[in-house]
């Protein structure tokens, strides 16, 4: 179990170092006010600055990058103050532009939380993309099976839930998994 509550700086540094050890170039955060994007006032997700590379443009630093993207979200500003909503936050991300897929990604995240931080598996909850019938995008059973197998290897039987909707709309990228960790209050 983790011995202390790490600071934001410690979490960011440890994540980026871990991804660098796994062959990723560490890049700085994109601008909070995106350039050349008339569709939005602020960067609201980690993937927003990555869109050109996700759509096929080569990234100057290669096929694997990691970052801590500054984000601002105002769509749920009335909810700020509960345990889930914020307006400004940093989103840690690692990106593959045609280099690796779910098998490597899920194992890396599992190892980061469990081996790097020593978090207790019994406090994890993982949700995977549940599909979108209207768009013809199927449920992501592949990711769910990968997560379940990792937990089974540690002697735990688990169920995997559906990823939550965002403002009533499910995302269409089939790799969206959410990892929740419930810590005990003392």
What are these regions (language model features)?
Residues 2-186:
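Structured aminoacyl-transfer and RNA-binding surfaces used for tRNA recognition/handling
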């Amino acid at each position: 179990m983790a011995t202390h509550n790490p600071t934001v700086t410690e979490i960011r540094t440890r994540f980026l170092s871990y991804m660098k050890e796994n062959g990723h170039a560490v890049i700085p955060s994109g601008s909070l006010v995106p350039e050349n994007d008339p569709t939005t006032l602020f960067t609201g997700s980690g993937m927003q600055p990555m869109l050109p590379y996700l759509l096929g443009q080569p990234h100057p630093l290669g096929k694997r990058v990691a970052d801590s993207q500054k984000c601002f979200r105002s769509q749920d500003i009335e909810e700020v103050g509960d345990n889930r909503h914020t307006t400004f936050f940093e989103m840690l991300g690692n990106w593959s532009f045609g280099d690796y897929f779910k098998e490597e990604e899920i194992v890396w995240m599992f190892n980061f939380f469990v081996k790097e931080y020593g978090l207790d598996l019994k406090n994890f909850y993982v949700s995977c993309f549940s599909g979108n019938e209207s768009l013809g995008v199927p449920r992501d059973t592949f990711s769910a099976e990968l997560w379940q197998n990792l937990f089974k290897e540690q002697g735990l039987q688990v169920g995997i839930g559906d990823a939550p909707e965002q403002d009533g709309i499910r995302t269409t990228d089939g790799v969206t998994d959410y990892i929740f960790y419930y810590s005990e209050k003392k």
